[in-house]
Amino acid sequence: MAVNHKTGSSRALVGLIAGILVAGALGHRLAFTYLSGPGTVDVRSAAFLNRIVANVNPLFPRKVDAETEITRVSAQEGVFIYHYRFVNVAVAEVNAGVLAELRPTVTRSSCANEATLNNFIRKDITLRYVYSDKGGRALASFDITRADCGV
């Protein structure tokens, strides 16, 4: 990914937005699992969130666009984690400006997605986004919480 160029930055942001749409689809899966599960369930519990993980991880890895893929999801108590990988870029090639744009772009998209709000954020489940380069080396990680979405 040519993230040192403006077109690369734009492609990365388009990929991020597409990734948010994948996250929204996962939110619908969370709602389905929540409705079909037992009557009283702590939806923030690691046990419940890991049931969601087990249901959706067979869908991955999945290309978000030519530059980005979602590799898997994971969970811990009160936190649902999305793992993304930039498939064509090494950590040394990443423009710091692109990384700086990640959090606000993903936050806006997540907070605007009703499925994400209703199935995660309003249930006080933190969303964690973890990004790595083509070799799996860490690039960025951040959380989105109720406070970020103002709910």
Please place each PLM-identified region on the residue numbering.
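Hydrophobic membrane-insertion alpha-helices, especially the h-region
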Residues: R11-A31
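N-proximal, solvent-exposed amphipathic alpha-helical segments enriched in charged/polar residues
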Residues: Y34-E77
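N-terminal Lys/Arg-rich, disordered targeting/topogenic segments
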Residues: M1-G8
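Solvent-exposed, acidic/flexible segments
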Residues: D42-S45, L49, Y82, A92-A100, ...
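Polar/charged, Gly/Pro-rich intrinsically disordered segments
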Residues: E67-T71, Q76-I81, R85-E93, L117-V151
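Short, non-transmembrane amphipathic alpha-helical segments
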Residues: A92-N118
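Solvent-exposed amphipathic alpha-helical surface segments
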Residues: T33, L59, K63, S109, ...
